[in-house]
Amino acid sequence: MTATIDVDNLMSRLLNVGMSGGRLTTSVNEQELQTCCAVAKSVFASQASLLEVEPPIIVCGDIHGQYSDLLRIFDKNGFPPDINFLFLGDYVDRGRQNIETICLMFCFKIKYPENFFMLRGNHECPAINRVYGFYEECNRRYKSTRLWSIFQDTFNWMPLCGLIGSRILCMHGGLSPHLQTLDQLRQLPRPQDPPNPSIGIDLLWADPDQWVKGWQANTRGVSYVFGQDVVADVCSRLDIDLVARAHQVVQDGYEFFASKKMVTIFSAPHYCGQFDNSAATMKVDENMVCTFVMYKPTPKSLRKG
């Protein structure tokens, strides 16, 4: 039997939980979260491995369970379906409200599948979110490791890359030395926890490095770092203008690389409570012109904890 969900009702309760998160477990039960995962999984499975979308659209980077900052993004830009969104992954781990964050986003995906797009980040992989907070949160708040496992089943169906207006290639991490054509991205297998090595693992993990030419091993211990020459070569070969990725904290929320052929977007201000970085989102208008909105970290006097 296909799972069904009253998505409006669930969204309303998630939006009313507030920033403390204290009311989540009393207002949303585990079975509802499992159903939300199941329905979201079917939506991801119905769409392509390379999401080919048209502007206008807002592109957002890492969120990392910073629920109040996710809501700031919607408050500033508008809510779907009036505004289209593409998120570049890393919804969970490190922040304090991972479950609210990922479930609200799944609700938007279910309700507005053609207006709200979510790529997978490296933190939507079990080896990572088992360690960096999401597993612990599922266990602490719902006393359930099964809930955590069901989230992994949904994450395994999430797409790894997107293409805006045929000109802006999007992924969480970076490029791959094995990437030669867009058709390779269209044919990426799902469901899958991408193996190492693979194009998939590079899309999740790779980083640009201004001191490197070509490809070198990544100090993260997985995938590669790549130079400006690689970005120029890939843009030429794939006939694209820009690569948009996330995966790294940048002080102003966005940072260009390779003569503006690549941009890093990071959308979690005051990341981990340890950095004083701003966040940013990138708006791509109907004419493929990109502009950035910055979100300053909340003043220290207003922060909790």
Curated annotation (Swiss-Prot):
GO molecular function: metal ion binding; protein serine/threonine phosphatase activity
Phenotype upon loss of function: No obvious phenotype. Simultaneous RNAi-mediated knockdown of gsp-3 and gsp-4 results in male sterility due to chromosome segregation defects during sperm meiosis. gsp-3 and gsp-4 double mutant hermaphrodites have egg laying defects and no viable progeny. gsp-3, gsp-4 and him-8 triple mutants have incomplete separation of sister chromatids during the second meiotic segregation. Mislocalization of MSP in activated sperm. In addition, have partial reduction in mpk-1 phosphorylation and air-2 association with bivalent chromosomes in the most proximal oocyte in response to MSP.
Sites where the protein binds Mn(2+) 2: D90, N122, H172, H247
Tissue specificity remark: Expressed in male germline including spermatocytes, spermatids and spermatozoa.
InterPro entries in the record: Calcineurin-like_PHP_ApaH (IPR004843), Metallo-depent_PP-like (IPR029052), PP1_catalytic_subunit (IPR050341), Ser/Thr-sp_prot-phosphatase (IPR006186), STPPase_N (IPR031675)
Binding site for Mn(2+) 1: D62, H64, D90
Enzyme Commission number(s) from the entry: 3.1.3.16
Tagged with keyword Chaperone: no
This protein's GO CC annotations: chromatin; cytoplasm; nucleus; pseudopodium
Active site: H123 (proton donor)
Keywords on record: Cell projection, Chromosome, Cytoplasm, Differentiation, Hydrolase, Manganese, Metal-binding, Protein phosphatase, Spermatogenesis
Compartment(s) where it occurs, according to its Swiss-Prot or TrEMBL record: Chromosome; Cell projection, Pseudopodium; Cytoplasm
Chemical reaction(s) catalysed: O-phospho-L-seryl-[protein] + H2O = L-seryl-[protein] + phosphate; O-phospho-L-threonyl-[protein] + H2O = L-threonyl-[protein] + phosphate
Chief subcellular location: nucleus
GO biological process: amoeboid sperm motility; cell differentiation; egg-laying behavior; male meiosis chromosome segregation; regulation of pseudopodium assembly; reproductive process; spermatogenesis
Superkingdom field: Eukaryota
Pfam families: Metallophos (PF00149), STPPase_N (PF16891)
Family the UniProt entry places it in: Belongs to the PPP phosphatase family.
PANTHER family found in the cross-reference section: SERINE/THREONINE PROTEIN PHOSPHATASE, SERINE_THREONINE-PROTEIN PHOSPHATASE PP1-DELTA-RELATED
Job of this protein: Probable phosphatase which plays a redundant role with gsp-4 in spermatogenesis by regulating sister chromatid segregation during meiosis. In addition, involved in sperm motility by controlling the dynamic disassembly of major sperm proteins (MSP) in the spermatozoan pseudopodium.
Protein name: Serine/threonine-protein phosphatase PP1-delta
